Amino acid sequence: AGRGIDGSARNGRLADIDISGARIVAGGGVYDAARYSEDNVVGVELFAACNNLKNIKLPMDVVRIEKDAFLNCSSLRSIVIPATVSSIVPSAGCTSLEEISVSGANTSYTSSDGVLLSGDAKSILWFPMGKRGDYALPATVTAVGSYAFRDCSIGKFVFPAGLTKIGECAFYNSKVREVALPSTLKMLPTGVFQKCADLKTVRLGNDVELLSDYVFDGCPLTDLYITAPLPPVCGSNTFATTGADFVKTCRLHVPKGRKKYYRANAK
């Protein structure tokens, strides 16, 4: 176990768990000081801090995997999602996770190259933190879920031309170095690249209209390219704690002949 019933740390030794033939049922004592189990639910922080856990196969009748069910399971390499699961919220701190696989009989979710997608393969929902290198999103993807790439180690992404939506904090605290977003994206939501401490270069498309609060908070940008003919609306905290010298250290690149419109815009 990772934690005792009072929430205190335990020096657990579990490395491989196969409970595919078991059931999770309601009742019994508390775990993590104040939580109780529910029928067929992998509850909030149920396996939290199981530092030696490497692989897990869940019960075949699980219907829901809640937020941070595997919080800080730093050795976890793979998770197998059963056919019955219809709701999943990602877990933080799974720094070694390389593969999320899904039963072929599951109609709510699928996986591609170990990445969790919606059943129709149009949305990326959970990207394993243990993956390295660059990553090209599947051509079918039109949306990226909130926190989907949080804390990931990918340095460069290739986005599909049909991408139309990115969720809040989707790339929060990731290692991304450069970003080129397609023109199909009209707005960037709150905190989408917040605390991306390696992000230097960003390219935004022709139709971008809104940069919400904290989009580039904590990002040491050196070059920001915007091809939209008119400047997008920015929140009062779009760049937040990026620093007082941001306007001196980051070069803004705009379309030829449009500089006066960007200079005249106060928002």
Place the predicted regions along the sequence by residue.
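Extended Gly/Ser/Thr-rich low-complexity repeat segments
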Residues: 2, 135-136, 147
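Short, aromatic/basic amphipathic alpha-helical patches
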Residues: 2-8, 32-34, 45-46, 236-243, ...
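Short, flexible, glycine/charge-rich loop motifs used to bind or transfer phosphoryl groups or to couple energy/partner
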Residues: 7, 46, 69, 89-90, ...
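Structural signature of tandem-repeat unit edges
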Residues: 12-40, 50-64, 73-87, 94-115, ...
